């Protein structure tokens, strides 16, 4: 199986190794001093492996296959989808971070747009990988630039990281905000301000 860093896009199909994942979970249980053969834990390696297969499903999906539907709507104004729920996994501690993504773009001169559900699926695809929030935000923006050729893209992600809430500094409720700005939103302050105002407006 080709090993690829999650920062790069897969050019081949990866496969989840269920037996290897189960064996690794069993070893982890032993390492923390547990008995993986006791009743409550006997099926845990298989359950965790199946959960990881779902949680990291974005590793096995091509972003180009998600943004595969375009519509020639001759639309040249902002398209903004707010409050897209996301659940991801911090690659440093393998614990969850969760929150929302706001994704906006201004179609290119050809007026091409994609389906609204495709944007939500794109967020899911990149969230379902071992991640850092900064990279997640940029990957969503760059995928839209690549596939849609828009005049501008703005992505804002707000998330709470359980690695800060349940361990370490233990600051539950702290929210991290990241943004990725491309094209017209980067060069035109008025366009950027309009999009950010709509995002912040409840």
Swiss-Prot record:
GO molecular function: GTP binding; GTP cyclohydrolase I activity; zinc ion binding
Enzyme class: hydrolase
Keywords noted in UniProt: GTP-binding, Hydrolase, Metal-binding, Nucleotide-binding, One-carbon metabolism, Zinc
PROSITE patterns recorded: GTP_CYCLOHYDROL_1_1, GTP_CYCLOHYDROL_1_2
Family: Belongs to the GTP cyclohydrolase I family.
Subunit structure: Homomer.
Protein name per UniProt: GTP cyclohydrolase 1
This protein's encoding gene: folE
């Amino acid at each position: 199986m080709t090993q690829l860093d999650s920062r790069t896009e897969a050019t081949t199909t990866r496969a989840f190794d269920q037996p290897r994942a189960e064996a690794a979970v069993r070893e982890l249980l032993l390492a923390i001093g547990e008995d993986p053969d006791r009743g409550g834990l006997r099926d845990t390696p298989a359950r965790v492996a199946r959960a990881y297969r779902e949680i990291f499903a974005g590793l096995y999906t091509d972003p180009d296959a998600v943004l595969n539907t375009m519509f020639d709507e001759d639309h040249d104004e902002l398209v903004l989808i707010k409050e897209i729920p996301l659940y991801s996994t911090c690659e440093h501690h393998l614990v969850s971070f969760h929150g929302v993504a706001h994704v906006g773009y201004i179609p290119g001169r050809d007026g091409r747009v994609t389906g609204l559900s495709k944007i939500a699926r794109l967020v899911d695809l990149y969230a379902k990988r071992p991640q850092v929030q900064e990279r997640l935000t940029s990957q969503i923006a760059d995928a839209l630039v690549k596939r849609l050729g828009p005049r501008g893209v703005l992505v804002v992600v707000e998330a709470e990281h359980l690695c800060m809430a349940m361990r370490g500094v233990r600051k539950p409720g702290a929210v991290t905000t990241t943004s990725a700005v491309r094209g017209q939103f980067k060069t035109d302050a008025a366009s950027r301000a309009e999009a950010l105002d709509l995002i912040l407006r409840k």
